[in-house]
Swiss-Prot record:
One GO cellular component, as annotated: cytosolic small ribosomal subunit
SMART domains assigned: S4 (SM00363)
Matches recorded under InterPro entries: Rib_uL2_dom2, Ribosomal_eS4, Ribosomal_eS4_central_region, Ribosomal_eS4_central_sf, Ribosomal_eS4_KOW, Ribosomal_eS4_N, S4_RNA-bd, S4_RNA-bd_sf
Keywords: Ribonucleoprotein, Ribosomal protein, RNA-binding, rRNA-binding
Name the UniProt record assigns to this protein: Small ribosomal subunit protein eS4
CDD domains according to UniProt: KOW_RPS4 (cd06087), S4 (cd00165)
S4 RNA-binding domain span: 43-115
Source taxon at top rank: Archaea
Gene Ontology molecular-function annotations: rRNA binding; structural constituent of ribosome
Family stated for the protein in its record: Belongs to the eukaryotic ribosomal protein eS4 family.
GO terms under biological process: translation
Pfam families: Ribosomal_S4e, RS4NT, S4
Stored SUPFAM superfamilies: Alpha-L RNA-binding motif
Length: 255
C-alpha cells in the first residue's frame, strides 16, 4: 500500500505548548508548511499575525493581510499564511515600519523583540553542517535552511573556509546573504540557550565537555555570575570572545 504522506491538519491539543492558541478556539489549528524551521521550534505566520501581534481577530482577516503582502520575513514578503517563523528570523510590518527579531525567552519559549531598522538589515545563522560543491567551493548549511557559499581559490587548500566550524555562527545581510562576520563556538563566546529548561538564558561559555556528536555539555556563566549547564545542541553563539552581543536582547537578559 502506498504511503499517504504527512497529515495536512494539526489538532489544537497537539500544537506546541508555546503557541498562543486555546482549545476553545477550535479542534484544529494551522499546521506550518515545510520550511526553514521544524514545527517544534516555529510558529505559523497566521498565528503570529493574529494571536501574537494582534493585527487580526480571525483567521480569515489574518490570511487576507498576509496575502496582501503586509509582512516581511528576513527582508522578503511572505504570502503563505502557513510559513514557519523561527528563532533569529527578522519580521517587518511593512505599513508601520516596525521590526522584530524572534528570540528564545524564558517560560514563554520565544518572544518578538523590537529592533531598529539598522539591526533589521542582518541576521545570525548557526552553522549546522558544511559540504563541498562543484568547483571545490565550500557551502555552509545554516539552522534556518539557508546555504551560504564560501568561494575558495585553491580547492586542495581551502584556507578561506577553514575558520568556519560547525555550531559556530555567521552574521549575514538579508536578503542578500552577504557574510558580515563569524563567531566560533569556543570558551569565552557569548551564547543564548534556545532549548531545554534554561531556554532564553544568556552567558559566556566557561567550559565545553565533549560528547557523542552534539551531546556534549556546555557550562555558561550569566551576567550575575550564576553557572548553567546545558546540551551543546541548545546553544547559539551571539558574539565571539571579548565582544558584546551582535544583536540587541530583551531587558535583563545580559548586562
Amino acid at each position: 500500500m502506498a504511503r499517504m504522506g504527512g497529515r495536512r491538519h494539526l489538532k489544537t491539543l497537539a500544537a506546541p505548548k508555546f503557541w498562543p492558541v486555546r482549545q476553545r478556539a477550535g479542534i484544529f489549528t494551522v499546521k506550518p508548511s515545510p520550511g526553514p524551521h521544524p514545527i517544534e521550534r516555529s510558529i505559523p505566520l497566521l498565528i503570529l499575525v493574529r494571536d501574537v501581534l494582534g493585527y487580526a481577530k480571525t483567521a480569515r482577516e489574518a490570511r487576507k493581510l498576509i496575502a496582501e503582502g503586509h509582512f516581511k520575513i528576513d527582508g522578503r514578503v511572505r504570502r503563505n499564511y502557513k510559513y514557519p517563523v523561527g528563532f533569529m528570523d527578522v519580521i517587518e510590518i511593512v505599513d508601520t515600519g516596525e521590526f522584530y527579531r524572534v528570540l528564545p525567552y524564558p517560560t514563554r519559549f520565544f518572544t518578538l523583540h523590537p529592533i531598529s531598522k539598522e539591526e533589521a538589515q542582518f541576521k545570525l545563522g548557526r552553522i549546522e553542517d558544511k559540504s563541498t560543491v562543484k568547483g571545490g567551493h565550500i557551502q555552509l548549511h545554516l539552522h534556518d535552511g539557508r546555504n551560504v557559499l564560501i568561494r575558495v581559490s585553491d580547492p586542495t587548500n581551502p584556507v578561506e573556509a577553514k575558520p568556519y566550524k560547525t555550531l559556530g555562527t555567521v552574521k549575514i545581510s538579508i536578503p542578500e546573504q552577504q557574510l558580515l562576520g563569524y563567531a566560533p563556538l569556543e570558551v569565552g563566546s557569548l551564547v543564548i540557550i534556545f532549548g531545554g529548561r534554561n531556554v532564553g538564558r544568556v552567558g559566556r561559555i566557561v567550559s565545553i565537555q565533549p560528547g557523542m556528536r552534539r551531546r556534549g555539555i556546555v557550562t555558561i556563566e550569566d551576567a550575575r555570575g550564576e553557572k548553567i549547564q546545558t546540551s551543546l545542541e541548545y546553544v547559539f553563539v551571539i558574539a565571539p570572545p571579548n565582544e558584546e552581543p551582535w544583536i540587541s536582547l530583551p531587558e535583563g537578559a545580559w548586562k
